[in-house]
């Protein structure tokens, strides 16, 4: 049997354990054919990944479900319980009456009885059937933070999601949610990397015992929509050279040292191994201080959800000024 990576776990506030590195399944259009995509995910399973992160908006739930089923059928893993599968409900389903049916649809897409973690993708609601990222004023609808969370709690109570969480929530939106929550979010999955270090949100979530997972830890370097701001950052390049590590390893180790987990996507088998070789070495205080001085800028502003006459009138409203 080929060598497998070993990834540590964290216990969430729900009592369930989650591997600290998730394999991301968001792929650029055109999405590869189902069997090809399932084969890539199966390769990641062979490498040792067990935490897989998807979303209804990615169009990859079925392929991931196929890979999980094949891994179980072929004896690559002992059973479903070896996996930690997370998915996110899109904005068109961010309504009290739509969340449960949407989660059931996700489970049907993947051929699963439950998710390990179900999240609300954005604190935003759009009209059902609206063209994604081409929203009109009429498509943008009021979002009920507390009502949608009650529906998530019902999914948890029914056993359809062992843990429930959110994505892209600010401190202020989490505070509003928690005012009326019976079950607190286990996870807040947010943009986090060395050029957007979440200096306000991270300590807030730690105080509330909500685990932070970083998406875009390398700013999607190499993708059409990506940026070189992390991978070509001169401070990281210098640290990587001095430690005989890759820039990606330094950037990912930094996230781990902040107490956060991260979602990584690569179809390159060598990088599947390389990206998790970060747990047996440390950054020095001097190196951490240098990273702390990197200028900060949020990469994703969410302008698609903004309209001067809509529920969210500015990016400042969406992120509650944390820009």
From Swiss-Prot:
Residues the UniProt record annotates as site (Lowers pKa of active site Tyr): 88
Variation of activity with pH: Optimum pH is 7-8.
EC main group: oxidoreductase
GO MF annotation list: oxidoreductase activity; oxidoreductase activity, acting on the CH-OH group of donors, NAD or NADP as acceptor
Reactions that this protein is recorded to catalyse: rhazimol + NADP(+) = rhazimal + NADPH + 2 H(+)
Associated pathway: Alkaloid biosynthesis
GO BP term, example: indole alkaloid biosynthetic process
Statement: the UniProt record of this protein carries the keyword ATP-binding: no
PROSITE patterns xrefs: ALDOKETO_REDUCTASE_1 (PS00798), ALDOKETO_REDUCTASE_2 (PS00062)
Active-site residues from the entry: 58
Keyword Oxidoreductase: yes
Assigned keywords, A-Z: Alkaloid metabolism, NADP, Oxidoreductase
Temperature dependence: Optimum temperature is 37 degrees Celsius.
Database matches in InterPro entries: AKR (IPR020471), AKR4A/B (IPR044497), Aldo/ket_reductase_CS (IPR018170), NADP_OxRdtase_dom (IPR023210), NADP_OxRdtase_dom_sf (IPR036812)
Residues annotated for NADP(+) binding in this entry: 53, 167-168, 189, 215-220, 289-297
Matching Pfam families: Aldo_ket_red
Enzyme Commission number(s) of this protein: 1.1.1.440
Subunit structure: Monomer.
Function per UniProt: Oxidoreductase involved in the biosynthesis of akuammilan monoterpene indole alkaloids (MIAs) natural products, components with various biological properties such as antidiabetic, antibacterial, anti-inflammatory, anticancer, and antimalarial activities. Catalyzes the conversion of rhazimal to rhazimol.
Annotated family: Belongs to the aldo/keto reductase family.
Protein name: Rhazimal reductase 1
Origin species: Alstonia scholaris (Dogbane)
């Amino acid at each position: 049997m080929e060598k497998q990576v070993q990834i540590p776990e964290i216990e969430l506030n729900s009592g369930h354990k989650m591997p600290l590195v998730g394999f991301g399944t968001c792929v650029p259009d055109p999405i590869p054919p189902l069997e090809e995509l399932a084969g890539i995910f199966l390769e990641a399973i062979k490498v040792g990944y067990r935490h897989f992160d998807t979303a209804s908006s990615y169009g990859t739930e079925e392929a991931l479900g196929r890979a999980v089923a094949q891994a179980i059928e072929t004896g690559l893993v002992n059973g479903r319980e070896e996996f930690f599968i997370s998915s996110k409900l899109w904005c068109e389903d961010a309504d009290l009456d739509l969340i449960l049916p949407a989660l059931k649809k996700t489970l049907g897409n993947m051929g699963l009885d439950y998710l390990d973690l179900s999240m609300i993708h954005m604190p935003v609601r759009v009209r059902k059937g609206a063209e994604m990222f081409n929203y009109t004023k009429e498509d943008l609808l009021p979002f009920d933070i507390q009502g949608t969370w009650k529906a998530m709690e019902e999914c948890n109570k029914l056993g359809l999601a062992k843990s429930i969480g959110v994505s892209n929530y600010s401190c202020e939106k989490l505070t509003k949610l928690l005012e009326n929550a019976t079950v607190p979010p286990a996870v807040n999955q947010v943009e986090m990397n060395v050029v957007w270090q979440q200096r306000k949100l991270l300590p807030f979530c730690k105080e509330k015992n909500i685990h932070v997972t970083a998406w875009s830890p390398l700013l999607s370097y190499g993708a059409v929509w990506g940026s070189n701001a992390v991978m070509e950052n001169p401070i990281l390049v210098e640290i990587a050279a001095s430690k005989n590590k890759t820039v990606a390893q330094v950037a990912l180790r930094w996230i781990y040292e902040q107490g956060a987990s991260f979602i990584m996507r690569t179809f390159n088998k060598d990088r599947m191994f390389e990206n998790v070789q970060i747990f047996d070495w440390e950054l020095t205080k001097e190196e951490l201080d240098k990273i702390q001085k990197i200028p900060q800028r949020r990469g994703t502003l969410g302008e698609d959800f903004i309209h001067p006459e809509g529920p969210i009138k500015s990016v400042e409203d969406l992120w509650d000024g944390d820009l």
